[in-house]
């Protein structure tokens, strides 16, 4: 029996959720980190984290686990560090507003992307405007490195409550890595961010019983071997793809 019964918090698409999810999955498909049909896998695009701990939590599912208070506490911890940092870094933020203003804005963005509903008004346009205008002085190697350093200190702070689900931190790492790579490409700085271990690959679940002959034949040899092995078949007895396909068709 699963130790979890998500959602812990009611979820809803935000202004950014669908757009960011679509872009992330498109990149992940290209990198073969998720199946080619990832956009159509209900459990993958759902806003609710899986109770199956063998499945990663996608970052748009984090709100269903964390809720608003944990997210706000994390962001407040981070910006407290920002405002205590060296002037060259902290002044870019302080000239735009006080600590609580930044906590509110950043928390809203995280909540919006992570499945907490329409919290970040203005969506992608607002996000782009902020980085191309308000934060442009830090959209470079030096600024990115300091931002990452402070965020890592925040995430590693034992006072931060990420729940007892070990999948949460890799999901946050994946979320941060996705945006850092996006900004590195857009503003042409080196993407050397290392937030820690991210989500593992999501493998396609293959059920031969629900597949047509054509669909089984279209599977790769590696997919056939993995799926047959999972069903207890000794694949060493089937040395070619044709033999593997024939065995799958018999099940």
Language-model features, listed with the residues they occupy:
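Core of compact, soluble alpha-helical bundle domains
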Residues: 2-251
């Amino acid at each position: 029996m699963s130790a979890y019964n998500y959602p812990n918090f009611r979820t809803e698409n935000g202004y950014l959720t669908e757009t960011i999810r679509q872009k992330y999955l498109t990149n992940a498909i290209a990198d073969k980190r998720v199946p080619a049909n990832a956009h159509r896998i209900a459990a993958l695009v759902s806003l609710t984290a899986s109770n199956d701990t063998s499945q990663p939590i996608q970052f748009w599912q984090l709100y269903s686990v964390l809720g608003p208070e944990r997210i706000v506490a994390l962001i407040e911890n981070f910006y407290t560090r920002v405002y205590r940092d060296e002037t060259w870094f902290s002044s870019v933020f302080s000239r735009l507003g006080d600590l609580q203003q930044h906590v509110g804005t950043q928390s809203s963005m995280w909540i919006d992307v992570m499945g907490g509903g329409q919290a970040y008004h203005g969506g992608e346009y607002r996000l782009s405007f902020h980085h191309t205008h308000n934060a442009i002085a830090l959209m470079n190697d030096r600024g990115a490195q300091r931002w990452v350093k402070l965020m890592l200190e925040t995430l590693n702070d034992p006072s931060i409550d990420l729940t007892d689900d070990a999948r949460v931190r890799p999901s946050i790492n994946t979320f941060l890595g996705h945006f850092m790579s996006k900004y590195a490409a857009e503003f042409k700085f080196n993407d050397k961010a290392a937030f820690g271990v991210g989500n593992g690959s999501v493998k396609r679940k293959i059920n031969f019983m629900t597949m047509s002959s054509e669909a089984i034949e279209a599977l790769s040899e590696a997919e056939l071997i993995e799926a047959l092995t999972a069903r207890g078949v000794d694949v060493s007895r089937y040395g070619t793809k044709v033999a593997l396909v024939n065995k799958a068709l018999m099940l």
